[in-house]
Amino acid sequence: QITLAAHKRMDIIVGALLMLGEATVYNKDAAITSGQTNNKLLEITLPFNFIKPKSGDVVVDGKNMFISYLREKLHSLAPDYGVYAKMIMTRASFNKLILGSSEFGEQYKMILGSNEMKLSTGLVSSSLASEVFTGIGLPRIEIKEDYVKDQTGKNVQIYADNRITLLPSDQIGYMRHHTPYEATDPVQGRTYIPSEGQMLISNYRDKNGRYMEYTAEWIPQISNPDLITNFDLSEIASIQSA
C-alpha cells in the first residue's frame, strides 16, 4: 500500500495554485475509485489578475509578436501591480511561446552578442532568454519541470502548460501548519516520528505487509495573490500548433 506523501501532495496543490489560481483536494479513497471526480474535500481559489489574450492580440501581419505584447501589457499593469521579479512557466510553454516568437531572433540579436550563434542553431537556454528579457525590461524566466505520482498511480505534471505566472518576488508565501490530531491522541500501538512542518511519519506492519503513513495538517498561504498576474495562453497555443 502506498500513500502519497504529504510534501508530494502539497507540491501538486501549490503548483496548481501558482499556474491556475485554483486547486482541489480530494478524498484519497474516493479519488482511487472515481478517478478524482467525487468527494472534493477542499477547493481553493486565489484572486489573481487573469489575462487571456486572443490571437489578434499577439499575431501581427502573420507573425507571432508575443514578446512585444507581453512588454506592452506589463507596462500598462505597472501602475496598479508594480514591477514583477520573475515569470514562471513550463519548458513546453517556453519553447512554444518565447522561442517560438517571431521577434526573438529578429530583434534581439544585439542583446545576445556572442551568443547569437546559439540562436541560429536553436540552442537557446532559459537563462540566455532571461538575459534578453531583463535587457529589455521584462522579468527573468524560471522554468518549472516537476512531476509527482498521485494516489491513483498516475504521474501528474505539477505546473500547467500554456500558462505564465508573474510573481512580485521570489518569496511566494508560507506553508502554514497545525499540530496533527494524532500527535495528542495517537493510534494505539503506533509510533510516530516527527518531521518538518509538524508532519508525523508512522511505519508499521501487519499480516498483509509493511506500511508507511504520513500525517500533516498544512495549507499554503500565497503572499499578495491580488498582485500576481497569470496569462492563460491556451488560445494562442492552439493557433500556433494548428
Task: Report each predicted region and the residues it spans.
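Intrinsically disordered or highly flexible coil/loop and linker segments, enriched in small
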Residues: K8-G15, V83
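A generic, well-ordered mixed alpha/beta core segment in the N-terminal half of proteins
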Residues: Q1-A6
